[in-house]
Curated annotation (Swiss-Prot):
Biological process annotations from GO: positive regulation of cell adhesion; positive regulation of flocculation; positive regulation of transcription by RNA polymerase II
Protein name according to UniProt: MADS-box transcription factor pvg4
Location of region: Disordered: 81-187
Assigned GO CC terms: chromatin; cytosol; nuclear envelope; nucleus
Function as written in the Swiss-Prot or TrEMBL entry: Acts in transcription regulation. May bind to a MEF2-like typee II promoter sequence.
Compositional bias (Low complexity): 84-100
Amino acid composition bias (Basic residues), ranges on this chain: 167-184
TM ranges: none
Originating species: Schizosaccharomyces pombe (strain 972 / ATCC 24843) (Fission yeast)
Gene that produces this protein: pvg4
C-alpha cells in the first residue's frame, strides 16, 4: 500500500506544521543542489518561516547571486560567462540592502504559460560588463614605470680613496676596506688625489692636505691642514683648446692625458721672501717623467715663476705661465695643498725651513733633493 497523499492546505497544528516545514525545506535544498550540479548553474533558496527567521541555501556565493538578481534579468544571466570555464565577474559594489529582501520584480510571465523563450523585443538587453583590453593596457605604462631603473643624476660625485699609508704608519690606522694601490710604493707617481674644479673663475674652495707625520700626541696619524686658495685661469680666455679640468685626477687620468693639462709650479716658503739665496731647486729637468702634468694656478699675481731662480734678480711683472710635463722647472706651484703652512709671513726662518723640508719630502714632483 502506498503513502497517503497529503492535501495541499494550511496545517493548523503547530507541531505537525513545524515537522512538515523542516522536512520539506531539506528536500527543497536537496533539489536545488542537484539542479546546480546537473545544469551547471547557480541556485539560491531563501525561506522565511512564520516567526520571521531567515533560512538560506545557495550553491555558490550568496551575496554574488543576490547582486546578479538585482541587476540582471533572467535571459541576461544566460548570456553571462559563468556557463563557461571562467568564473562570473562580480560587480563593483554590493549593496547592503540585498540581505533585507528588497528585490526588483522579474519579468517571468513566460514561465506561466509558455515553454519557448521570449523574443528579443520582449527581453531587456544590456551590455555585459566584460573586461576590455583597453582597461588592461592603461595599467601597463604605470607598471613599466615602477620596474624601470632610475638613471643616475648629473650631480653624482665620484668618491676618492684616502691618503695612502706609509711605512712608519701604525698598522691599526690602515683602512681595512681600501686595498693598497699599485702606485703607492712608486715615488715617481703621486697617489690619486682628488681635485675639484671650481664652478667659475675666481671662486674660492677649501683644499685639504693629509700629512703622514706624527700628531701632537707623539703617535703616527694624519695631520690635516685646510686653507683657501683662489682659482684663477688666465689661459682659459685666450686658449679655447684648453680642456676643462675634471672633477678628480687619478693616476690613470694622468697617464692618458699628459699633454692635455698645463702646469704651474710650487710656491716658495715664506722665508724665501727675506733670504731668497738660501734655496735652490735641483733635479727638475725638462721631460722628467717624475713630474705628472698637474694643473695649478697662481694665487698671487705679484709672485712670478722666476722667483725660484736664484740667479735672476727682482720679480718680473705677472704674466700667464704654462707648460706640459716638467718644462717649468723654475716655476712656482701655487694653489697646492703641499705648501699651506708657509703662507704666513710671520714664521721664522727656522720654522719655514722645517716646514718646507716636510713638504719637499711628500711632494709628488720629486722635490726631495731641495738644498738650503
Amino acid at each position: 500500500m502506498g503513502r497517503k497523499k497529503i492535501s495541499i492546505a494550511p496545517i493548523t497544528d503547530d507541531r505537525s506544521r513545524s515537522v512538515t516545514f523542516v522536512k520539506r525545506k531539506q528536500g527543497l535544498y536537496k533539489k536545488a543542489y542537484e539542479l546546480a550540479v546537473l545544469a551547471d548553474c547557480e541556485v539560491a533558496v531563501t525561506v522565511i518561516d512564520r516567526k520571521g527567521r531567515l533560512h538560506v541555501f545557495c550553491s555558490s556565493d550568496y551575496q554574488r547571486t543576490l547582486q546578479q538578481l538585482n541587476t540582471l534579468s533572467i535571459y541576461e544571466l544566460k548570456n553571462r560567462s559563468h556557463f563557461s570555464s571562467s568564473p562570473v565577474e562580480e560587480s563593483s559594489t554590493v549593496s547592503p540592502e540585498t540581505t533585507t529582501g528588497s528585490f526588483t520584480p522579474l519579468n517571468n510571465k513566460h514561465l506561466k504559460s509558455q515553454d519557448q523563450p521570449l523574443s528579443d523585443s520582449q527581453l531587456d538587453t544590456g551590455d555585459s560588463p566584460a573586461t576590455s583590453e583597453t582597461t588592461v593596457q592603461d595599467y601597463n605604462p604605470q607598471v613599466q614605470s615602477y620596474c624601470r631603473p632610475e638613471p643616475l643624476s648629473s650631480n653624482h660625485v665620484r668618491s676618492c680613496p684616502p691618503f695612502p699609508p706609509t711605512q712608519h704608519h701604525h698598522p691599526h690606522t690602515r683602512p681595512p676596506h681600501h686595498p693598497p694601490h699599485p702606485h703607492f710604493h712608486n715615488n715617481n707617481y703621486p697617489p690619486p688625489y682628488c681635485f675639484q674644479s671650481p664652478v667659475s673663475p675666481g671662486a674660492t674652495v677649501p683644499l685639504q692636505h693629509h700629512s703622514p707625520y706624527p700628531s701632537d700626541n707623539g703617535f703616527p696619524g694624519h695631520r690635516r691642514q685646510t686653507h683657501f686658495a683662489p682659482y684663477y685661469y688666465p689661459q682659459r680666455a685666450t686658449s679655447p683648446s684648453l680642456k676643462q679640468v675634471p672633477t678628480y685626477l687619478g693616476t690613470h687620468v694622468l697617464q692618458q692625458d699628459q699633454s692635455t693639462y698645463d702646469q704651474k709650479v710650487l710656491m716658495p716658503p715664506a722665508s724665501y721672501l727675506s733670504s731668497p739665496n738660501q734655496y735652490t731647486l735641483k733635479n727638475v729637468s725638462p721631460g722628467n717623467p717624475a713630474c705628472p702634468p698637474f694643473l695649478y694656478e697662481h694665487p698671487n699675481p705679484q709672485l712670478t715663476p722666476e722667483m725660484f731662480d736664484v740667479k735672476q734678480g727682482s720679480p718680473i711683472p705677472p704674466t700667464a705661465y704654462s707648460g706640459s710635463s716638467c718644462e717649468t722647472s723654475q716655476h712656482t706651484i701655487a694653489n697646492t695643498p703641499f705648501l699651506a703652512y708657509d703662507r704666513s709671513p710671520s714664521l721664522t726662518n727656522q720654522e719655514a725651513e722645517s716646514s718646507f723640508q716636510d713638504v719637499a719630502s711628500i711632494s709628488p714632483h720629486s722635490l726631495s733633493d731641495v738644498k738650503y
